[in-house]
Amino acid sequence: MTLVPMVVEQTSRGERAYDIYSRLLKERIIFITGPIEDQMASLVVAQLVFLEAENPEKEICMYINSPGGVVTAGLSIYDTMQYIKPKVSTLCLGQAASMGSLLLAAGEPGMRYALPNSRIMIHQPSGGFQGQATDIEIHAKEILDIKSRLNDIYVKHTGRDLPEVVANMERDNFMRAEKAKDFGIIDKVIEKRLDIEESN
């Protein structure tokens, strides 16, 4: 069972209690923590769309600490980030691996950050399937198509050429924050919030 801290605020109508994530959502901060799967992705997409409806001009901050997860779930978050009008800044704290690193790279150019001890990992998608030979062939084609799509997304957001992205994603490729900056996944390694304010 996961315990979620509650925050109590004084209002003109008395006290109001929020879970910590709802309170942070009021500040336009979205957390992506843990494995990326369908239910979590639906919640993140809903938060992005809600914040756009509330103020389409104001920046949204996405904090990422994730080992990755289901590709289609991650792509639903990615597509929504690109679809909505507000700029989405991304910040890695802890780790951004697999789909987590793709979402980190997908932030607004110039607004993609990582803390100094963050770990970023990119790799090609994996999949296992059992069944009839024809079904295995269908799924093999699908995973190759997904691999190609993910490569194209990394090319778009890192500025690297396709052969370089393909070579770097052939196996699990772990990076420190500085290396992720050199590769183009993030724009800046930050130690303090002031570093973000100075870069904007």
Swiss-Prot record:
EC number: 3.4.21.92
Cross-referenced SUPFAM superfamilies: ClpP/crotonase
Keywords: Cytoplasm, Hydrolase, Protease, Serine protease
Entry keyword annotation includes Secreted: no
GO MF, any single term: serine-type endopeptidase activity
Pfam families: CLP_protease
Function text: Cleaves peptides in various proteins in a process that requires ATP hydrolysis. Has a chymotrypsin-like activity. Plays a major role in the degradation of misfolded proteins.
PANTHER family per UniProt: ATP-DEPENDENT CLP PROTEASE PROTEOLYTIC SUBUNIT
Protein name: ATP-dependent Clp protease proteolytic subunit
Organism, as annotated: Ehrlichia canis (strain Jake)
